Amino acid sequence: MFLQDLGWSGFFAAQLHSAPDPNPDSTPAGVPGRVASANHGRFLIWTEAGTIDAGVSGTLRNSGALWPAVGDWVIVRPEDAVIDRVLNRQTCVSRKQPEREIREQVLAANIDVLFIVSGLDRDYNPRRIERFLVMANESGARPVVLLNKADLAESLGLNLTEIVASVQQLSPAITVLPISAKSDENLDALPSQLGPGQTAALIGSSGVGKSTILNRLLGDERQATGEVRASDSRGRHTTTSRQLFRMPASAANQSGWLLMDLPGLREVQLWANPDKSAGQPTQTLEASFDDIQALAASCRFRDCTHTAEPGCAVTSANLDPARLANFQKMQKELAHLERKTSPRLAKETRAKWNAIEKSVRSHPKRSS
């Protein structure tokens, strides 16, 4: 297989000589490869010469550098089956770990298109779609919303045209595709969303049909699928790990492309790269809310948080209350995350409280 067919580009090629070899005395030299799957510290790596089941070198393990994730490009030594280095990512889909500790969980690396899958049954939730759109915007991947189970729209009494239009209004620049993994409706439109050798990932809740979509596109039952409870449209976690698949060439994409199936997400907690978004969590969020971004330009204060400030054009506008509340909720999440992860803000916060404590000590409360 050729590296270009796996997503290799000049962005990664330029990094080959941008850092010293961590093992300059090792022979043979490492070769570039892409992480196709990961399982308990072992990684399946695709290279031009074939597939390698590799571990991580001690140098990389102890360096504090990037840890390999599915979709990553790495430098691997075929003879030793060891990964020496992870190349910088072009895009990165992440969330905050669903636990109290503030940590990033990388869901997918080097994704060009993020297919946000929502079922048209009881899973349909515009507020959750908004969260996924923010996640995609932060990652650098292009979001495409897939409204699955379109074949059920009529039986559920839904106006499919109106639903597509309402999702499109969430972010006018995005592509929204009604599909049916069960009947193959509109699935042939997915390959045309990517260029040759590009990579997409399927993301959404459990039971929305991600694995079924993958199987239909592959023409093979490669991923297990589960039944969905009719009472609440909830599904079981049938996909438990991340894995890349090479998709067959088609009329829409003659060179083929790659698709990653992600486990269903019960929680969509946002993550913002501290270096990328330092000092501007609101600006990062506003990019996913076109209407709010346009209104924010007319706010009286440049650093308006769109909550209680006078002269706020956002809170004064006739916005959907649920949409505005969702924006404000995510804004608080990102601001809290930045305070916890930004060294600059942590230092400023400590200085602020030190000044307050010093002031209290210098001006003790007088007894009456």
Model-inferred region functions:
Residues R127-R142:
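Histidine-anchored nucleotide/phosphate-binding helix
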Residues F115-V117, A201, L259:
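Structural motif
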Residues M1-P126:
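N-terminal accessory targeting/assembly segments
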Residues F2, P24-A29, S63-D80, V86-L107, ...:
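Helix-rich effector regions associated with P-loop NTPase G domains
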Residues N110-S118, E138-A150, S171-I179:
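Conserved beta-strand/loop subsegment of P-loop NTPase cores
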Residues K210-G226:
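A conserved segment at the C-terminal end of the G1
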Residues L152-V208:
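Canonical P-loop GTPase G-domain recognition
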